[in-house]
Amino acid sequence: VSFINNVSGEDEIKEFFDIKTTPKRREFIKNKWKNNNGFFKPFEDVFNDISIVKIFSDQATKHGEPGSYINYMKKKILRGIQRTDSHLNPFLQHIFLGYYQSEFVFPYLNSKNNQVLELIEGDIFNINNISYYNIVSLSNIFDWSDIDYVKENVEYLSQLKKGSAVILRQLNNHKDWHNIFNKYFIEQKSFDLYWKIHDRSLFYDHFKLFIRK
């Protein structure tokens, strides 16, 4: 809503993401947005510390500099918009349109297979048989965590079998967890380099892959 009120209108946003729009026209819209004096306002409205804490609590900003999320998210989203195929990015579509343009954007949305998932409410310590799993994805939970909690997680994950993988992401957080994981895991740094280039979700600085020794 803030972007519509301060920068652009709904019709123009739809035109930007329409696959029938010419590259020249899309570039014009893109430059119009970037040069708009109100371009900064939506990020101030949405990503200020007060709004973030109100929604996620103060734990969400634990490792970020105070007030840094406004510029951080502006930079990330602007970089995404500047990509040649930005109109095809489902994450940008969801941000600006509120929906995906295609039902085929993610394979799991239209999978014909019967996917039965076991849902466990709680943290990783609520999973009694953690060694059963080959891949553990922690999302960006460590952005919310102090060092002691990270250490507790790593100790628990040490139960994983050799060759198992732990994946985590970092948003506005440059903490290096290597020294904590190093006791039991080997970091695959090429994973981070690859996803910094190819990730479509735009928001993250780091993508860490640790393999159980």
Predicted features, each with a name:
Residues 141:
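Hydrophobic adenine-recognition pocket in adenosine-nucleotide-binding enzymes
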Residues 125-137:
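A short acidic, Gly/Pro-enriched loop at the edge of an enzyme's catalytic core
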Residues 129-130, 145-150:
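Active-site-adjacent loop/helix micro-motif of nuclease/hydrolase catalytic cores
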Residues 194-213:
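Core SAM-dependent methyltransferase catalytic element
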Residues 149-164:
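A short glycine-rich, Lys/Arg-flanked "PGG" loop and its adjoining helix->strand segment in the class I
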Residues 1-111:
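Class I S-adenosyl-L-methionine-dependent methyltransferase module
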Residues 162-175:
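Conserved beta-strand signature within the Rossmann-like core of class I S-adenosyl-L-methionine
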Residues 108-127:
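Adenosine-cofactor binding site in Rossmann-like domains, unifying the SAM/SAH pocket
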